[in-house]
Amino acid sequence: MSQKLSFFQQNTRNGSGASRTLVIKPPTIQPKPENSISKTFSK
């Protein structure tokens, strides 16, 4: 717990942590809609 908190604090201080999560989230959400679209096309 303490390690996670300290790591989170470092990320928020640097600001790169917040930007990284924002950049990582969209790619993870995009593949799902793309897969559903490709499935409808294959049908």
From Swiss-Prot:
Bias (Polar residues) ranges: 1-19, 33-43
Superkingdom to which the source organism belongs: Eukaryota
Region listing for Disordered, in residue ranges: 1-43
Protein name: Putative uncharacterized protein DDB_G0281869
Source species: Dictyostelium discoideum
Taxonomy of the source species: Eukaryota, Amoebozoa, Evosea, Eumycetozoa, Dictyostelia
